[in-house]
């Protein structure tokens, strides 16, 4: 009769779990000892109980010696393994880049129309469609750049027109200020007889008319003025 396979799981009962731990621990230590003796192997075993108690076995003079040997071994082999993996990764990357460069060079030759002897009609049509799509994208980009340049030129034109209008306004203000200053100068200056006009009888009268003497009289109207006239007469 074949025994069924027992499912391994944690023993819930603490007493049963402790009894099982003691039995299995002793059996494991015995197996480790037998392996070291029968096969002349260096064996080290470390076990912590559920309560944290340490159990250990070492076929070497000390457990630490076996642990140090393990550390040195893993350090050397892990480093060598890592180096080998890095070298292989570099080789794979180099091979991948070489394939990509070859594909790009092939595409470049197709675009330039080189080495087309072995192409079929379908391949040439496909290449033509790709070129047309590329040209369409190039034209769109070119149109976009031209529109941007035109927009910048229009903005610059608006700025220049605005600056020109401001300068015209300042010029008009300066002309108006000059006219006002000139008018004030001509109206407030005293009248003078022109030097280049000859003095004649008519012009002398005009000159006398320009020289007017004013007197101040105090008294009743006509009194002082008449007496002065009689004296002068």
Swiss-Prot record:
Domain MADS-box: 1-61
Keywords recorded for this protein, A-Z: DNA-binding, Nucleus, Transcription, Transcription regulation
One GO cellular component, as annotated: nucleus
GO BP: positive regulation of transcription by RNA polymerase II; regulation of transcription by RNA polymerase II
Location(s), subcellular: Nucleus
InterPro entries linked to this entry: MADS-box/MEF2_TF, MEF2-like_N, TF_Kbox, TF_MADSbox, TF_MADSbox_sf
Gene Ontology MF terms in the entry: DNA-binding transcription factor activity, RNA polymerase II-specific; protein dimerization activity; RNA polymerase II cis-regulatory region sequence-specific DNA binding
Record PROSITE patterns: K_BOX, MADS_BOX_1, MADS_BOX_2
Domain (K-box): residue spans on this chain: 87-177
Reported function: Probable transcription factor.
Protein name: MADS-box transcription factor 56
Species per Swiss-Prot/TrEMBL record: Oryza sativa subsp. japonica
Recorded name of the encoding gene: MADS56
């Amino acid at each position: 009769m074949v025994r069924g396979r027992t499912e391994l799981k944690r023993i819930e009962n603490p007493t049963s779990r402790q009894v099982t731990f003691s039995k299995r621990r002793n059996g494991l230590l015995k197996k480790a000892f037998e392996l070291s003796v029968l096969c002349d192997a260096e064996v080290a075993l470390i076990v912590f109980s559920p309560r944290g108690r340490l159990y250990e076995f070492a076929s070497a003079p000390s457990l630490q010696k076996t642990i140090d040997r393990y550390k040195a071994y893993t350090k050397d082999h892990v480093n060598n393994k890592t180096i080998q993996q890095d070298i292989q990764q570099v080789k794979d990357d180099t091979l991948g880049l070489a394939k990509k460069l070859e594909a790009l060079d092939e595409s470049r030759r197709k675009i330039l129309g080189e080495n087309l002897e072995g192409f079929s009609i379908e391949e040439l049509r496909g290449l033509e469609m790709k070129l047309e799509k590329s040209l369409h994208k190039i034209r769109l980009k070119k149109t976009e750049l031209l529109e941007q340049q035109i927009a910048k030129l229009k903005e610059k034109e608006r700025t220049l027109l605005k600056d020109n209008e401001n300068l015209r306004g300042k010029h008009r203000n300066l002309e108006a200020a000059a006219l006002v200053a000139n008018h004030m100068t001509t109206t407030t200056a005293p009248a003078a007889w022109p030097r280049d006009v000859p003095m004649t009888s008519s012009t002398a009268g005009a000159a006398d008319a320009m020289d007017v003497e004013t007197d101040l009289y105090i008294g009743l109207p006509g009194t002082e003025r008449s007496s002065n006239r009689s004296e002068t007469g």
